[in-house]
C-alpha cells in the first residue's frame, strides 16, 4: 500500500503494478467502491505489457476519510495530482461509474497531453431526471430532490 498527499492534505491510497517503463493504465472505481473492484483485471493487463495503477478516491477504501473536497472536480484534481506524482506519460484512463464521471471532469478541467486514451463504462449522462433523460436518480429532477435536502 502506498500513499500520496493531495494539495489539500488528503492521503490517497494507490497501488502500482507492472514495469514502470510500460504504458500506464489508471483504473478508476465508482461511487462507494475501492480499488479492490479492479483486482481481477490487474494480472491480465500486466501480462499484456501494461503498467497498472489503482487507487481509492478520497473517503473511499484505504484513502483518508474526509468531509471536504467531495466533488467531481476535486476528484479530477486528485487524479491529476496522482498522474503528476507518479510522473506518468501516455496514460490510458479507465473509469467505471463515478470513475467515468471523474474522467469527464478531468477532461473538462485539464488539457493534458499525458493522457492518450479514455475508456468509460456504466456512467449515466446525468445523475438527475430531465426532459431528455428519464432515468435519473430515484426518477426525480434536481428540483424535486432538493425538497428532501
Give residue ranges: language-model regions.
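A generic local structural motif
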Residues: 11-14, 39, 79-81, 104-106
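Long, low-complexity, intrinsically disordered N-terminal extensions of eukaryotic proteins, enriched
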Residues: 1-2, 147-149
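Flexible "cap/lid" loop of the alpha/beta hydrolase fold
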Residues: 104-108, 114-148
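Anionic, Ser/Thr-rich low-complexity intrinsically disordered regions
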Residues: 27-40, 59, 64, 78, ...
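N-terminal cap/lid segment of alpha/beta-hydrolase-fold proteins
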Residues: 1-12
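Structural signature of beta-strand start/N-cap positions in the alpha/beta core
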Residues: 24, 51, 89-92, 116-117
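Conserved HGGG/HGGXW glycine-rich cap/lid loop of the alpha/beta-hydrolase fold
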Residues: 10-65
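Active-site loop/oxyanion-hole signature of alpha/beta-hydrolase fold enzymes
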Residues: 7, 47, 54-94, 98, ...
